[in-house]
Amino acid sequence: MKRKFVSNLILVLVLNFIIKPFYILGIDAEILKITELNNAGTYGTYFSLLSLSFVFNIFLDLGINNYNTRNIARDNNKIHRELNGNLSLKLALSFFYLLLLFTVGIIFSYNWYEIKWLTVIGFNQILVALILFMRSNLSALFLLKEDSFISVLDRVILILFCGYFLWAGTTNTLITIEFFILSQTLAYTLTLIICIAILKNKIHEFKLHWNIPFFKSTIQKSLPYALLIFLMSIYYYSDVVMIERMKNNYEAVSYAHGYRFFMAFNMVGYLFAGLLLPVFSKMIKEGNNVSPITWLSFRLIFLIAILICASIWPIKDELLFWRYEIIGDNLLHSSRTFGWLLLSFIAISCNYIFGTLLTANGSLKQLNIMAFTGVFINLFLNMILIPEYGSEGAAFASLITQLFTLFSQIIISYRQFHFQLFHVGGIQLFAFIILTCLTSYTIHYLNLFSTIWYINIITTLIVGGVFSLILRLVSIKDIFKLVKSHQNELI
């Protein structure tokens, strides 16, 4: 079982670090570039509609997946009752979700074209939610390799399908936002069918079970968690909607240029959260001291985020030109926006650690108060900054919001777990930041090793990694300790 777990963990990490970033920066970013060349502003409209669908995404789940995984993992014989009951609730929530999106679209004065594609995007989100639900059953049955395969299957299909039209010599006039949205529908549908087929071999039948008391009980238990996710979704995704509504879809495109890279980098924090949640949950339940592993995780993700930010910062312009072929004021504006997003990435990465810890602890009241305040700060800043600064103002508002939530979560964690706030070695961290930034500046601006930007990035990452070892901020032993903790808590 331990060997199975470790091999699956390695498989998940490899798949997520290779396939998903390649999809974001290869397929999605290429679609952005081509659609903006063919019909400027259309990707901005799509990006805004997609972000709006993300804001209300929690209404497709309400914590059902976690509940489903936990119950079936404890007793596999419950899978027929739990799966069928939760599937029925999922379908009911899906109808409500589409109705909610349609209503919000009307309130926001979207035209018929935008309403139509918002509906299709909403349907795609329903397919994604159903895939995640089916995956929760695979995970609960310990079908780990199958779950890993399904986790990236939709992206693989999109890479193959869209990649053919993008790079097989066909005319780029075929590449439109409509093509991209419907390609996602195809990929999600095929993935869902394959996922159902895998589960079908284990449970043999799917049967809808409408149990109203069960629905009410599940929703009531999930409300605090659902409220937290909804509030966080507002300040994570509403900025793009506000940019497009308050300015125009061209400004939304400027935000999207850097955001594609931000999302690729964000895979690091997402994987940390998935790794740590079961570890924190069991340690808290057993009354173990979570301080060492919390600060170890913080050091690891902080160092990774600083390395990425420092290595990318000096060549923001070159990177955006290479990926999107934008020039002039458009490039300068997008680059400044990207800069604020890079700084936000550091705060968000650290938020994954403390947010996961507090969620595992059940500190939902404190987190909801924090998130509500974060929403107010974000919306207030966006309303002031977007009319004047557009995407740059929204990215800056995001940075301030994420810094607020980070410091709030550190303070809450300190009160809940009596942490030593400077347990991580503040002097070493400060020295690491200074040394890494100076190294990046020297390598990039003085062309110390090469004039090729990606070689300079790799060099900065390597030298920064050496600094982290010299300053004893992290060691290979620490990484194995974290993986072993995850292994021990799940097996």
Regions found by a protein language model. Give the residues of each.
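N-terminal membrane topogenesis motif
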Residues: M1-L25, H80, N84, I212-L228, ...
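Interhelical loop/hinge segments that connect adjacent transmembrane helices in multipass membrane
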Residues: M1-V6, T173-I181, I193-Y236, L275, ...
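Signature of the first transmembrane helix
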Residues: R3-N65, L98, F102, N124-Q125, ...
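Interfacial segments at transmembrane-helix termini and the short loops linking adjacent helices
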Residues: T35-A40, I106-I121, I312-F345
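Helix-loop junctions and terminal segments of transmembrane helices
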Residues: L60-N76, G258, F262-F298, G355-A360
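Membrane-interface junctions at transmembrane-helix termini in multi-pass inner-membrane proteins
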Residues: N71, L127-L153, L342-T373, I384, ...
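Hydrophobic alpha-helical transmembrane segments
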Residues: I115, T119-G122, F149-N201, F372-N378, ...
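Membrane-proximal transmembrane or re-entrant/amphipathic helices at the cytosolic face
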Residues: Y441-I491
